[in-house]
Amino acid sequence: MTFSNYVREKTTKNLSDLNNKELYIQLLNYVKEEAEKKELNSDKKKVYYISAEFLIGKLLSNNLINLGIYDEIEKELAAANKRLSEVEEVELEPSLGNGGLGRLASCFIDSISSLGINGDGVGLNYHCGLFKQVFSKNEQHAEPNFWIEDNSWLIDTDVKYTVPFKNFSLTSSLKRIDVLGYKKETKNYLNLFDIDSIDSSIINEGISFDKTDIKKNLTLFLYPDDSDRNGELLRIYQQYFMVSNAAQLIIDEARAKGSNIHDLYEYAYVQINDTHPSMVIPELIRLMTENYGIEFEEAYSIVQKMTGYTNHTILAEALEKWPLEFLEEVVPHLVTIIKKLDAVIRSKYEGEDIQIIDKYNRVHMANMDIHFSNSVNGVAYLHTEILKNSELKHFYELYPEKFNNKTNGITFRRWLEFSNRPLAAYLKELIGDEYLTDATKLEKLLAFVDSKEVAAKLEEIKRENKLILKEYLKETQGIELDENSIIDTQIKRFHEYKRQQMNALYVIKKYLDIKNGKLPKRKITVFFGGKAAPAYIIAQDIIHLILCLSELINNDPEVNKYLNVYLVENYNVSVAEKLIPATDISEQISLASKEASGTGNMKFMLNGALTLGTLDGANVEIDELVGRENIYIFGKESDEIIKLYETAGYVSKDYYNKDGVKEVVDFIISEDLVKLGNKERLERLYNELLNKDWFMTLIDFEEYYAKKEEMLADYENRDLWLRKVIANIAKAGFFSSDRTITQYNEEIWNK
């Protein structure tokens, strides 16, 4: 049935009679009904991809593309004088994730479904997400990010589980979202657990709330502030609630297919996405021993055969360690299992650094994952090598066979087919549409690397995308973009290791250059996007600096003809879908050795931006694929950085005192900025750079500045620049999440 006929049947109206909100609700229901007709993937073994976050983005467009009806719907609406892009704007973006971890999980479940693999996502149904970012007085403020409406993609189910805590139990309710594969007759689910007693009225000013009222707050927020005891306890409540539900679901579904639990590993594989779901290991063991009479040794060996751990970071702060007393306060029944697992390891191996419970009585989640899984993977070649040779070296020596690399990927359906419609249409005309299911087919573009005609068309498409971004930012943020400028973009959660502060120093130097009469050949627009965790003070200070610089520069008539700076408010997937296709320079400038992979680098590459980056994360593989002539690499390499950490060999003042650096850093506390901002914040950031600079901003600053200047010069040589653009798009196929998931499936889940 066509959509027009569907609407006529449901409402007795024509498409032209409905407003955009009404059209959205009708389209939502139409797509949900189409999805309902799909059979579930049903292989004997099922993958459970457990993740604290899924940054799924808006689903209407994604589902229309995967159903193969996007163009058809667009034409039907156009015939009724309606625009699908305007209908899409009605949808609220689900607040189920924050950064790269959640976006990766979303690309992965898309690929799992598109490849016809039997595999579901499992997480929590957060009502307010991380937070909605609002700027006021050049500072970030946090508000609840409500997104659940009466009409949404969530499907209610009758599935309920009892989750036991020390002093009470909670009954969960399961909501599902259909995960449609690209042009597939089958589907999977994203399983999101919730409680019916959630109460958003307990939220006070901003996003503060009573962290002790678990029955009302449990699924309110993603990553609630854990800077105090109650916050840490709430995180444990959340994580256990997620994994207990997951474990019960896994066992129920396996039993329904004939498992006797002794053979559970033949029916299920659990992929632990970072350390947040780690308690699924002891919880599965607990359920097997308590409910099914399986001996402890057999139970942990079953779990070991059906569990894999993906490590996403080498930052010690992100490898979770929970005080044993906190776990005893929340889930004492699980502590019994954890202590037994710790005893198993102590009976086999010496060495404090590999134990599950350390001498300070902290439970190391990553250590437990590594011991009691059969796979440990990093997410880019360099990251995995650092894990094996440095951060997890002791474990690699124990279990070399467990360690493997699975370089991250992105779904081209969302990050090209939807977000860059002009480029996708041209690629199909030029090389066909096979790349949507076999991304390596993008290499056919290499035949056109010297084509002036193709280069001219790509330039035209980039300009079209800049105009789309211009209209979007004017409507949503009041930003006036100059579409003739070079667009230089850094979009990531705010963290010192990602070094937004180094980019801010570049902006200061460029500002001072312009004030001194050194003018760029073409205007540059620098975009930042991302949120800082409310408890992460220095990250908030970096945001404050950028907002002050933005106010200063954009209102200075001497400078704003040549330079604009914007921090996009409440950056999310929807903003990324507009910003990435319009970008010329992709900022991937983390301190070498600190970024596990990154996926923004892949999205920019696919959409025709050139990378300015360190040899970190997946930048290393981009460099190898495109060749050094098609990427802009700068900075110290990971081996040297790791040695500097080992020897405490980096002293920021040595770099601060160099010509051209001192003036730039000192500008942070200049009168020009202080009068626009908060003196305490600016001085704190200044002192951090001067006296600590843990992530070595100043070590790479001069090289970074010089390399960006080289990029700006190369941009003026349009033939050279566009040749590099074609080479980057052509080589982006390796970074398809379909490739990543095929490797997971063949080398881990069904090994």
Model-derived regions: residue spans:
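A conserved ligand/cofactor-binding region detector
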Residues: 1-751
